[in-house]
A protein has these predicted regions:
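Short clusters of hydrophobic/aromatic residues that line enzyme substrate/ligand-binding pockets
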Residues: 51, 73, 218-221, 430-432, ...
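Sec-dependent N-terminal signal peptides
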Residues: 5-14
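N-terminal secretory signal peptides that target proteins for export/translocation
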Residues: 1-2
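Aromatic- and Gly/Pro-enriched helix-to-coil junctions and flexible linker segments
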Residues: 18-155, 241-247, 477
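Cellulosome-associated attachment modules in secreted, modular CAZymes
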Residues: 83, 424-483
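Beta-strand-centric surfaces of beta-sandwich/beta-rich domains
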Residues: 73-85, 114-311, 316-425
Length: 483
């Protein structure tokens, strides 16, 4: 058998001996860092240090190995063994082992010519020319006092009539401080009143929008995330006179900064046949009153009936600082079928997200949606805002808590399961033979394409060549199920 086959299959079945002996930055480590880290860790982005060159990465090599080995970085909260989402950013076991082997070997640089190249990170919109741009009224000043700041900005629409849209895209003005954003919609004028009562630009609000606007939760942004871009015939409607609400979370900074974030609005190219609605599981769906006693870990279980066949597009659990975990799923009437939706075993308020399923996900009529969340209101919770712990109830403030699951959905139609909601992920790009499993057959196909340049079917990293970097990507996906 060709020695390259032996090499590939040996790695695929877990020996890792070649990687342990010969791993270098340019051949093995750079693709991992560029694929998982550099979207945030580069100049002008939220990462506190850049990881763009050998010298930059090597100087933090041991630190990178540690924070990735414990799952702290990259910051992806959903459990990838439970369900998958668009933009999933999780290091595989072979990738983690490669980083460890590289550090153990003394962080060798290797041949710069073997580097597949720095990614092309687009500036401006990631999905095209917007039809409207909603902007903050002025740049928001961050004083540089090392505080986390949560500010809501009211963006009037002033459009004639209801407006059908296919996408909203948050365009941060200053990635040095823009940590994440939440979008909402207000048709009551309440947000404008809160804004008028606050002398600062916008108004401060930690947990949400400062009033009961949860039913108008409209999306979210975190660094590296692609905006939700609905398929043809599917979209949302912004009522005439509505205000778009932009809650910005600004991370701590030691120097004064300013931010002027914009929201790009993309109108539907065709009439909306199915409007996206947001189903909300909240405290009223719980099995017990939403009260968190001090010095106690408390769990809640909420349920919602599914009254029609629906297709899910996105999901976003939401709690505050005392929350520690989430688990959302659907069950059949006889409890013989469970549809996994999202599991977040280690909830982090600062990295909450609006997670898009790879394909529309059907939940049949008669099923039940379940949401389970745990809250640690003890002194052992380092994020507990109360010292000592206090009785905690539902509310908008930092020391309050919430239980919400936001789910975007449409009424189901035949074939929805085949409709992709994001770009093809490497997970399924590596399924070359189309059997929904990344396995030996796919490894052999990649091997047959090894050395190809330009228009290569096995070019997983899109660098116009099939190289060792593609081998490593496939090994990281080996055994994955693309369903």
């Amino acid at each position: 058998m060709d020695s390259r086959v032996l090499f590939l299959l040996a790695c695929a079945f877990g020996t890792g001996e070649v990687l342990a002996q010969d791993v270098t930055f340019h051949t093995h480590v750079a693709p991992i860092v560029y694929n998982h880290c550099t979207s945030c860790h580069r100049e002008g982005e939220i990462g506190p240090m850049p990881f763009t060159t050998y010298a930059e990465v090597a100087s933090y090599g041991e630190f990178i190995e540690y924070v990735t080995s414990i799952g702290y970085m990259p910051p992806w909260s959903p459990d990838a063994d439970y369900s998958h989402f668009v933009g999933e950013n999780v290091l595989s076991e072979p990738e983690l082992q490669t980083l460890s082997n590289w550090v153990s070997a003394g962080k060798p640089e290797g041949d710069p010519a073997a580097n597949s190249g720095f990614p092309d990170f687009p500036s401006g919109s990631q999905i095209g020319e917007p039809d409207h741009v909603l902007s903050m009224p002025a740049a928001y000043p961050h004083s540089g006092d090392m505080t986390e700041q949560y500010q809501v900005f009211v963006l009037p629409t002033d459009w004639d009539g209801a407006t059908s849209i296919r996408a909203l895209e948050v365009q941060p003005g200053n990635h040095n401080v823009a940590h994440h954003a939440i979008l909402g919609l207000d048709i009551s004028g309440t947000a404008a009143q809160l804004d008028g009562a606050d002398p600062a630009l916008g108004y401060e609000s930690f947990g949400g929008f400062g009033f009961n606007a949860e039913s108008s939760f409209f999306g979210a942004w975190v660094p590296g995330a692609l905006p939700v871009n609905y398929p043809p015939g599917i979209g949302r409607v912004i009522p005439e006179g509505a205000d778009v609400l932009l809650q910005m979370h600004y991370g701590p900074t030691a120097v004064p900064e300013s931010d002027l974030t914009e929201v790009n609005v993309f109108l539907s190219d065709a009439p909306i046949e199915r409007e996206v609605f947001t189903a909300i599981m909240g405290p009223q769906h719980l099995d017990a009153p939403f009260v968190l006693p001090p010095n106690q870990v408390t769990s809640f279980h909420g349920t919602m009936p599914v009254t029609a066949d629906v297709s899910l597009l996105n999901i976003a659990p939401h709690s505050h600082l005392i929350g520690t975990s989430w688990w959302v799923y659907a069950t059949s009437p006889n409890n013989q079928d469970t549809i996994p939706l999202i599991s977040i075993p280690d909830w982090d308020f600062n990295w909450q997200g609006y997670f898009t399923f790879p394909n529309m996900t059907k939940i049949p009529q008669g099923y039940t949606l379940h949401g389970e969340a745990t809250y640690d209101n003890t002194a052992g919770n380092p994020f507990n805002p109360n010292d000592p712990p206090q009785w905690v109830y539902y509310g908008e403030e930092t020391a309050d808590e919430m239980f919400f699951v936001f789910i975007d959905l449409v009424l189901y139609e035949d074939g929805d399961e085949e409709i992709a909601l994001g770009p093809a992920e490497p997970l399924c790009l590596a399924d070359f033979n189309g059997d929904d499993i990344v396995g030996v057959a796919d490894a052999l196909i990649l091997l047959g394409d090894f050395g190809c340049v330009s228009l290569c079917s096995a070019d997983l990293d899109d660098d116009q060549a099939v190289t060792v970097a593609d081998v490593l990507l496939l090994l990281g996906l080996y055994g994955s199920n693309c369903n």
